[in-house]
Each structure stands twice: as structure tokens, then as C-alpha cells.
Amino acid sequence: MLRRKVSTLLMTALITTSFLNSKPVYANPVTKSKDNNLKEVQQVTSKSNKNKNQKVTIMYYCDADNNLEGSLLNDIEEMKTGYKDSPNLNLIALVDRSPRYSSDEKVLGEDFSDTRLYKIEHNKANRLDGKNEFPEISTTSKYEANMGDPEVLKKFIDYCKSNYEADKYVLIMANHGGGAREKSNPRLNRAICWDDSNLDKNGEADCLYMGEISDHLTEKQSVDLLAFDACLMGTAEVAYQYRPGNGGFSADTLVASSPVVWGPGFKYDKIFDRIKAGGGTNNEDDLTLGGKEQNFDPATITNEQLGALFVEEQRDSTHANGRYDQHLSFYDLKKAESVKRAIDNLAVNLSNENKKSEIEKLRGSGIHTDLMHYFDEYSEGEWVEYPYFDVYDLCEKINKSENFSSKTKDLASNAMNKLNEMIVYSFGDPSNNFKEGKNGLSIFLPNGDKKYSTYYTSTKIPHWTMQSWYNSIDTVKYGLNPYGKLSWCKDGQDPEINKVGNWFELLDSWFDKTNDVTGGVNHYQW
């Protein structure tokens, strides 16, 4: 399917001559060394003592209107099993089902193909009325919501905040995000939540783009923890988009995976089983925090403890099934701005010292790369759609190379330090020398000059021409595929023409051969 989709892109590019269609990308994952994790335990314990009776509302945005319906219903069943009834913890789910993939009647009491609200409790799910915030939904309605519409997400958050007021809000978004759950869709890494029952103007399942969420949600919908139960969302671009203080929707912390996520997703029964009144411990070793695994009281649980829960239980679950290729990271998004500043400073210096060829040697091309990466290096389609590389590994290899100046190495070292601060916990593939708490966040680094072609046409088109979604502008306005408007690409741009100010401008200066007033292939004049 990926090959067919990319071929369609190529054909559209030919029809529109100098302009082209393409698709966006995103990323996420990381963990600390044992010493750092133990220090974190002390920090989060002291934090939790400040509020001994907090309320926590967890919002589960469940887009099951696609071929993940069976898997997502299983996730809800896991939640019902693991959830411990508590006046301090509410678990609210917006569930959109499909008429095509599952006829299950047990998980939610009946089979349906519309959109419903539920309060998840121990071994049961109670259907809810949407009230003023979501009047289309009642306990008897047949309303079909478009989960790819940001206004639906906005309504859901507003409903939860109005009717289940809390001191801490967690938003879990579950569906396709790029990879494992349907690796063949080239849009998966730039967006999330595909709704098969609601098509966009191109006749494809509608979805939520990163920039689109920022355009529609506001600071009012912000959350304490944002978790993507989806693939390829652990990127620097995604993390920066939703950093606190951006003036709109944000999250203080983030749970996400840089590579693809296996089909079962998060292990919700184990996660919720460890959120219980009174806390305590079990007899399992905790490789994330050290010692034995702790249970956390919802009345005092912190963002860091929640993040550690997701990371540790995903590690346990995937490793128990022999899947050592899986990753998950927990990020402190308050540190995302300093990471971006460090990467942008490095980008400016790479431009000033004309180090394109040296970076390309590190990155590699075709079927070989020595950099830690989160895509299939043997697939040219994936080189086009999501060439995501581990940021820390890139900076570390720059720092160790003899082909860069001492200034460049110092800037790379500074970026490594900032990444270490942002990546609180992470785990990854030990065979790739994954460093917990350092590796696990990706960045877009394409082979922009390479030309792509298929048996559909002999015309060869540079990868960068097909990657115009990676942009600061409104790409739809210029006839390109959605969505652009990435804060990572916009912030830090140098106002002077032909002068690099950030990572995006560095890539555009390397790969866009036409930088006149038209902005070249992606309509952006760096």
C-alpha cells in the first residue's frame, strides 16, 4: 500500500508540474540511567506529598472506526480489568466504532458502529450523556462523530473537564500514528486518528494533523500528560508542537514511541492495576525506577510516576513476548524549547561551515545507515515518508567525528545535555546500543536529493519535493497536501533571505534547488 500511495504522489506531482503532493511525519521515546532514575524517585515522591487528595481524570480518545477496532476494544477490556474504583480517579472514554471489523457485544455491552461516551469502572463500562458540551451524544443516540475532526477532540476534552473536574488531566489518543498498526499508510507519521467512516476531500479517511490540533484547540484544553498509543509520534517536532507556554493547546509531559508500536499497544490492565489507593509495591523488579515496582495512589500520583508506569509496563509486556524492537519514552516538554534552541544553533553552525556532505555521510542513504533510526532503511518509500533518526545518536556521532570543528562538537554536546534533561525515561532495542534516558527522540533527516521513481513513470522526483508537508506554512493554501504549520519549522527562522536560522531552514537550504520568491518546491523561501 505504501508503494501505491507514493506512486500516486508521483503521478500527482507530474500533473501539477512544479508542485507536488506529500505527507507529514512525527516522532517519540527515551529513559534514564539507573542512578538518574533513583534520583527521580526521590523527586517525584517529594512532589506527590504536596497534594494528598488530588483528583485525576484520564481521557481516552478511542478512534476504533478502522481496522484497529478489535485491538482497541481489547484495550478497553484491559482498562476494565485493571481499573480500581476510586473517588480520586475518573476514566472517561469517547469510543467510535466501525461497522466492518468487529461485532463484539461484551466489552461495552452491545455491538454498535456509532460514537458513544463511557465511564470505565472495574469490570464495567457505563454509558454517558454528552450534556451541554457534547449534545449530539446521549445514552440512546446513534451519533457518528468524525474522530479526525479537531472540534470533536475539543468537545471531548471540554466535556471531561466540565463534568469530571480534576487537579490532573491525562489525554490518551489511541489509533494509527504511523507504522505497526498499519505501517503501509504514508500519512501515519504526521497525523493521528484515522476515521474510516468520514472521508476527507481526497476520499481518504479523515485524520488529525499535528498543526490542525494546534489550530483548533486552545490553552483551555491543555493537559498534564499527553500519551500517544500510536506509532512514530516520539519526535522532536511533535514534542515541540505541544510544549507548555506555546499559547495554545499543550501538555506538560508526553508519552510516545519513536518507532512503530506493536499491535497490542499499551498494557492497560497492568498500568491501571498499579494506580490504587494506598500505593504499596509488588515483587517485580522495576527497570525504570529501580527497586521493586511501586503502586501509586491516584490522590498523590505525579506526572513522572504516570510516565514511569507507561514505560515500565510497556517494557515488561513487549519483552515478555520477545519483542525487543519496541521503544517507549516519557518526555518533560518544559525542556522541549531548550532542546530546539540547541538543535537550531547546531543547524546554523552546520550551514556556516558547509557540512552537508559530512552529515550525509553520517546519515547514509539507500539501504545503509549507521545512525540509530526509526524506519525501514531498506524501503525507499519509508525514506520518503518518515526518515526519522535518533537525535541524541546524531549529536553523539557528530561529537565523536574528526570531520567537524570543535565549535560544532561543542554545540552537539550541548544538544546532548539538553536531550538528557528532556528525556526522563526511555527504553529501546538493546542490540542497537540504546542508551536509556538519552536515546528515544527522533528528528526528520531526509535524503532530500535522492530521486524517486516507480514503474508507473520514468520521471524521477527528489525526495524533498515529496516532503513539502514538513513546513512552517499552511501547505493547503499553496495546493500542497496537508498540513504544514509545524512550530518546529517556524520558530527560530532567520528573517534574512538565504540565511539559515533553524533545522528546517538548514534542510531546505540543502535540498530545495529553487529559492526564489516562489519559495521553490515547498513554497518556503529560506
From Swiss-Prot:
GO terms for molecular function: cysteine-type endopeptidase activity. It comes from the Bacteria. Residues 28-50, 182-190 form a propeptide. It catalyses: Preferential cleavage: Arg-|-Xaa, including Arg-|-Pro bond, but not Lys-|-Xaa. Its EC number is 3.4.22.8. One of its GO terms (biological process) is proteolysis. Residues 1-27 form the signal peptide. The keyword Transcription regulation does not apply. Cysteine endopeptidase with strict specificity. Heterodimer of a light chain and a heavy chain held together by strong non-covalent forces rather than by intramolecular disulfide bridges. This is Clostripain. It comes from Hathewaya histolytica. The gene is cloSI.
